[in-house]
Protein backbone atom coordinates (compact mmCIF):
# COMPACT_ATOMS: atom_id res chain seq x y z
CA UNK A 1 0.00 0.00 0.00
CA UNK A 2 0.89 3.66 -0.09
CA UNK A 3 0.15 6.67 2.06
CA UNK A 4 0.10 9.32 -0.67
CA UNK A 5 -1.01 9.21 -4.30
CA UNK A 6 0.24 12.08 -6.47
CA UNK A 7 -0.50 12.65 -10.14
CA UNK A 8 -2.77 14.50 -12.47
CA UNK A 9 -6.06 13.65 -14.15
CA UNK A 10 -4.27 12.31 -17.23
CA UNK A 11 -2.23 9.89 -15.07
CA UNK A 12 -5.41 8.65 -13.37
CA UNK A 13 -7.09 8.04 -16.72
CA UNK A 14 -4.16 6.44 -18.56
CA UNK A 15 -2.99 4.22 -15.70
CA UNK A 16 -6.24 3.36 -13.90
CA UNK A 17 -9.02 4.27 -16.35
CA UNK A 18 -10.36 6.83 -13.86
CA UNK A 19 -12.04 9.94 -15.28
CA UNK A 20 -13.73 12.90 -13.60
CA UNK A 21 -17.43 12.09 -13.40
CA UNK A 22 -19.58 14.35 -15.56
CA UNK A 23 -16.65 16.46 -16.72
CA UNK A 24 -14.70 16.66 -19.99
CA UNK A 25 -11.13 17.72 -19.23
CA UNK A 26 -10.42 18.35 -22.93
CA UNK A 27 -13.20 20.96 -23.13
CA UNK A 28 -11.68 23.27 -20.51
CA UNK A 29 -9.49 25.31 -22.92
CA UNK A 30 -6.67 25.65 -20.41
CA UNK A 31 -8.90 26.52 -17.45
CA UNK A 32 -9.01 24.23 -14.45
CA UNK A 33 -11.72 23.86 -11.85
CA UNK A 34 -10.31 21.99 -8.88
CA UNK A 35 -13.70 20.91 -7.54
CA UNK A 36 -14.27 18.84 -10.68
CA UNK A 37 -11.37 16.62 -9.64
CA UNK A 38 -12.88 15.52 -6.34
CA UNK A 39 -14.44 12.54 -8.12
CA UNK A 40 -11.00 11.45 -9.35
CA UNK A 41 -9.66 11.67 -5.79
CA UNK A 42 -12.57 9.66 -4.41
CA UNK A 43 -12.19 7.00 -7.10
CA UNK A 44 -8.47 6.67 -6.36
CA UNK A 45 -9.19 6.37 -2.62
CA UNK A 46 -11.74 3.65 -3.40
CA UNK A 47 -9.16 1.79 -5.50
CA UNK A 48 -6.43 2.21 -2.85
CA UNK A 49 -8.26 2.21 0.50
CA UNK A 50 -5.08 2.34 2.60
CA UNK A 51 -4.00 5.61 0.97
CA UNK A 52 -4.34 8.58 3.30
CA UNK A 53 -4.11 11.43 0.78
CA UNK A 54 -4.59 11.99 -2.94
CA UNK A 55 -2.98 15.02 -4.53
CA UNK A 56 -3.64 16.19 -8.09
CA UNK A 57 -1.59 18.88 -9.78
CA UNK A 58 -3.57 21.26 -11.98
CA UNK A 59 -1.82 22.85 -14.93
CA UNK A 60 -3.67 25.08 -17.36
CA UNK A 61 -1.70 25.73 -20.52
CA UNK A 62 -2.22 29.14 -22.11
CA UNK A 63 0.89 28.70 -24.29
CA UNK A 64 4.42 27.28 -23.97
CA UNK A 65 5.58 30.19 -21.81
CA UNK A 66 2.39 30.88 -19.87
CA UNK A 67 0.66 28.37 -17.58
CA UNK A 68 -1.65 28.43 -14.63
CA UNK A 69 -0.60 26.18 -11.77
CA UNK A 70 -2.35 24.82 -8.72
CA UNK A 71 -3.39 21.65 -7.00
CA UNK A 72 -5.90 19.84 -4.85
CA UNK A 73 -5.38 17.56 -1.87
CA UNK A 74 -8.05 15.11 -0.74
CA UNK A 75 -7.83 13.65 2.76
CA UNK A 76 -10.37 12.39 5.30
CA UNK A 77 -13.24 13.13 2.92
CA UNK A 78 -12.26 16.78 2.50
CA UNK A 79 -10.96 18.52 -0.62
CA UNK A 80 -8.38 21.29 -0.22
CA UNK A 81 -7.67 23.63 -3.13
CA UNK A 82 -4.53 25.72 -3.49
CA UNK A 83 -4.43 29.22 -4.90
CA UNK A 84 -4.04 29.25 -8.67
CA UNK A 85 -0.84 30.91 -9.82
CA UNK A 86 -0.42 32.61 -13.17
CA UNK A 87 3.12 31.86 -14.42
CA UNK A 88 3.60 34.24 -17.35
CA UNK A 89 7.31 33.78 -18.08
CA UNK A 90 8.24 30.12 -17.69
CA UNK A 91 12.00 29.63 -17.73
CA UNK A 92 12.03 25.81 -17.41
CA UNK A 93 9.30 23.27 -16.61
CA UNK A 94 11.83 20.48 -16.03
CA UNK A 95 11.85 19.63 -12.33
CA UNK A 96 8.42 21.13 -11.69
CA UNK A 97 6.90 17.83 -10.57
CA UNK A 98 9.90 16.90 -8.44
CA UNK A 99 9.84 20.31 -6.76
CA UNK A 100 6.11 19.87 -6.12
CA UNK A 101 6.69 16.53 -4.39
CA UNK A 102 9.67 17.89 -2.46
CA UNK A 103 7.55 20.84 -1.35
CA UNK A 104 4.72 18.51 -0.39
CA UNK A 105 6.99 16.30 1.72
CA UNK A 106 8.41 19.40 3.43
CA UNK A 107 4.92 20.83 3.91
CA UNK A 108 3.44 17.65 5.37
CA UNK A 109 6.37 17.27 7.79
CA UNK A 110 6.40 20.95 8.78
CA UNK A 111 2.66 21.70 8.91
CA UNK A 112 1.63 18.32 10.34
CA UNK A 113 -1.94 19.31 11.19
CA UNK A 114 -2.59 21.64 8.26
CA UNK A 115 -3.12 19.92 4.90
CA UNK A 116 -4.12 23.23 3.32
CA UNK A 117 -0.83 24.88 4.23
CA UNK A 118 1.16 21.79 3.15
CA UNK A 119 -0.55 21.86 -0.26
CA UNK A 120 -0.05 25.60 -0.62
CA UNK A 121 3.66 25.19 0.15
CA UNK A 122 4.05 22.46 -2.49
CA UNK A 123 2.29 24.49 -5.17
CA UNK A 124 4.22 27.67 -4.36
CA UNK A 125 7.58 25.83 -4.33
CA UNK A 126 6.86 24.23 -7.69
CA UNK A 127 5.56 27.49 -9.10
CA UNK A 128 8.83 29.22 -8.23
CA UNK A 129 10.80 26.36 -9.78
CA UNK A 130 9.27 27.30 -13.14
CA UNK A 131 11.25 30.58 -12.91
CA UNK A 132 14.63 28.80 -12.62
CA UNK A 133 16.65 27.04 -15.30
CA UNK A 134 17.66 23.46 -14.53
CA UNK A 135 16.10 20.38 -13.07
CA UNK A 136 16.11 21.21 -9.36
CA UNK A 137 14.63 23.91 -7.19
CA UNK A 138 17.04 26.49 -5.79
CA UNK A 139 14.59 28.68 -3.89
CA UNK A 140 14.58 29.13 -0.14
CA UNK A 141 11.81 28.33 2.30
CA UNK A 142 11.48 32.09 2.90
CA UNK A 143 10.90 32.71 -0.83
CA UNK A 144 8.21 30.02 -0.93
CA UNK A 145 6.52 31.42 2.18
CA UNK A 146 6.62 34.94 0.71
CA UNK A 147 4.83 33.70 -2.41
CA UNK A 148 2.30 31.92 -0.20
CA UNK A 149 1.59 35.21 1.59
CA UNK A 150 1.22 36.97 -1.80
CA UNK A 151 -1.05 39.82 -2.70
CA UNK A 152 -3.86 37.62 -3.96
CA UNK A 153 -3.29 38.40 -7.65
CA UNK A 154 -1.82 34.98 -8.36
CA UNK A 155 0.93 36.59 -10.41
CA UNK A 156 4.42 35.26 -9.83
CA UNK A 157 7.48 37.45 -9.59
CA UNK A 158 10.89 36.46 -8.41
Predicted regions and their residues:
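Conserved phosphate/ATP/ADP-binding segment of small-molecule kinases
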Residues: 1-78
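Conserved post-catalytic alpha-helical subdomain immediately downstream of the catalytic base
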Residues: 80-151
Amino acid sequence: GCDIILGNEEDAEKVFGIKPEGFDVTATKGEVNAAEFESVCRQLMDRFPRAKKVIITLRGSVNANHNTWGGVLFSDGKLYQSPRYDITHIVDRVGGGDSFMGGLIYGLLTYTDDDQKALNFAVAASCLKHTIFGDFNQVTVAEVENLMKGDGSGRVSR
